[in-house]
Amino acid sequence: MFFERSEIKLALGCLLLAFPDYIAAFESDEYHWLNETYQQFIIDCIVRANEYLADPDTAQLRTWVRTRGIAHHSLKEPTDYTFSGLLYQLFAFEPFRSILSTPMDTGVRDLRPTRNLALLTQLVGKFEYLNKVMVLSPKQFKGKRQVDAMSERLFNLYFRLLWDGGIGEYEDDSEYAPSGCVSFMTIHQSKGMEFPIVITDSLSSVPRKQEDKLLTDILES
């Protein structure tokens, strides 16, 4: 799934760490109403980011995360960027820089992280459009600083709903069986194709009965 990809967890984890007030509220159980499984997902993202940032070679990214976190905690004036702007800044560092530098003529397997990061920026951009987020501001918005209210809405509502609904990873519709990947197909999709190994499921199942008894009685009368 999209949200289980390593590059997505790392990107979201770094983004979360850039908002220490959200992290503090999360750790103090202010968001206790969140689904436990989703809470664990948030924790996994934070742990993934912390583990990566612990590497001495990630000093530049670690400095960026810390600088942004301090700035957002003590925000006095509106920023000249939004959440998507933060993502673009984040992508200037490794490993995102290398991922986004992958040649577009490589296979689907190698391009998947690139496509997933592109989809993440689209999702964040759509959130900003729907919520009219033009800046991150310390001004009051519904009883909280706008930067805090919007970060909560982004992580606790928007991403939660997307995570709960499920988002598929990038797939190339023109390539049913890319090298190094396992294809999941319907019987209709697989017609006329040959594979060295085929696994089928539910062979003993039968189609669901969806007949309308009232309609059947009318037709038979």
Segments predicted by a language model, with ranges:
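Conserved catalytic alpha/beta cores of large enzymes that bind or transform nucleotide phosphates
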Residues: 221
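Short Ser/Thr-interspersed hydrophobic loop/turn segments at strand-loop and sheet-helix junctions
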Residues: 199-204
